[in-house]
């Protein structure tokens, strides 16, 4: 698993929002100001079309903790078929590391990857060590219960509002019901198509 040396709070400040690295309370405590990272905290100015495309791409990559090579590969896989912003988000939301995080079995996508790589996650009752594995509707996901004990104090209420997942949290069990059809970033279809022109 690759590591990022930059601090997560800098990513959030750069994008101007919480990228789910922190709880809202902790994010407000850490962010302190709306200034972007820099020597003197440069304020945001007018963004060009290219800058908007770049910021959109960076935000998606940071949100799902993926790197340029992997993102580019995903982009061209999706572009072979009819492509729109929902297709891209659906693809990323189907990743096993993301679903483990959505189930609140981990406090971050990075921790999800650790759980998966160390063999503590099962898909349809078979061990799966591939964080980028794409789930299909009806897939059953289970996790080694010993890793749930430290999660009881975590904000479990988030999962109650995710209608495309079924979760029995304290049994370490969940089902991927359907595709999310969520547009988390209000993406413009034409803007996304221009990323790798």
From Swiss-Prot:
<dbReference type="InterPro" id="IPR036986">
    <property type="entry name" value="S4_RNA-bd_sf"/>
</dbReference>
<keyword id="KW-0689">Ribosomal protein</keyword>
<dbReference type="InterPro" id="IPR022801">
    <property type="entry name" value="Ribosomal_uS4"/>
</dbReference>
<dbReference type="GO" id="GO:0015935">
    <property type="term" value="C:small ribosomal subunit"/>
</dbReference>
<dbReference type="InterPro" id="IPR001912">
    <property type="entry name" value="Ribosomal_uS4_N"/>
</dbReference>
<comment type="function">
    <text>With S5 and S12 plays an important role in translational accuracy.</text>
</comment>
<dbReference type="InterPro" id="IPR018079">
    <property type="entry name" value="Ribosomal_uS4_CS"/>
</dbReference>
<dbReference type="InterPro" id="IPR002942">
    <property type="entry name" value="S4_RNA-bd"/>
</dbReference>
<comment type="similarity">
    <text>Belongs to the universal ribosomal protein uS4 family.</text>
</comment>
<feature type="domain" description="S4 RNA-binding">
    <location>
        <begin position="94"/>
        <end position="158"/>
    </location>
</feature>
<dbReference type="GO" id="GO:0042274">
    <property type="term" value="P:ribosomal small subunit biogenesis"/>
</dbReference>
<keyword id="KW-0687">Ribonucleoprotein</keyword>
<dbReference type="GO" id="GO:0019843">
    <property type="term" value="F:rRNA binding"/>
</dbReference>
<protein>
    <recommendedName>
        <fullName>Small ribosomal subunit protein uS4</fullName>
    </recommendedName>
</protein>
<keyword id="KW-0694">RNA-binding</keyword>
<comment type="subunit">
    <text>Part of the 30S ribosomal subunit. Contacts protein S5. The interaction surface between S4 and S5 is involved in control of translational fidelity.</text>
</comment>
<comment type="function">
    <text>One of the primary rRNA binding proteins, it binds directly to 16S rRNA where it nucleates assembly of the body of the 30S subunit.</text>
</comment>
<dbReference type="Pfam" id="PF01479">
    <property type="entry name" value="S4"/>
</dbReference>
<dbReference type="GO" id="GO:0003735">
    <property type="term" value="F:structural constituent of ribosome"/>
</dbReference>
<keyword id="KW-0699">rRNA-binding</keyword>
<dbReference type="Pfam" id="PF00163">
    <property type="entry name" value="Ribosomal_S4"/>
</dbReference>
């Amino acid at each position: 698993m690759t590591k990022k040396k930059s601090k997560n709070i800098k990513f959030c400040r750069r994008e101007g929002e919480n990228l789910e690295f922190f709880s809202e309370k902790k994010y407000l405590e850490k962010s302190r100001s709306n200034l972007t990272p820099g020597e003197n905290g440069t304020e945001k100015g007018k963004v060009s079309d290219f800058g908007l495309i770049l910021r959109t791409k960076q935000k998606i990559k940071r949100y799902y903790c993926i790197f340029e090579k992997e993102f580019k590969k995903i982009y061209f896989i999706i572009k072979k078929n009819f492509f729109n912003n929902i297709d891209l988000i659906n693809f990323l939301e189907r990743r096993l590391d993301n679903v483990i995080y959505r189930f609140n079995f981990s406090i971050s996508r990075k921790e999800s990857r650790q759980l998966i790589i160390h063999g503590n996650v099962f898909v349809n009752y078979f061990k799966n060590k591939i964080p980028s594995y794409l789930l299909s509707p009806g897939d059953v996901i289970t996790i080694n219960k010993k890793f749930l004990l430290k999660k009881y104090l975590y904000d479990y209420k988030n999962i109650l509002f995710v209608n495309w997942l079924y979760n029995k949290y304290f049994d370490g069990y969940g089902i991927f019901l359907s595709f999310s059809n969520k547009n988390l970033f209000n993406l413009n279809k034409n803007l996304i198509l221009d990323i790798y022109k």
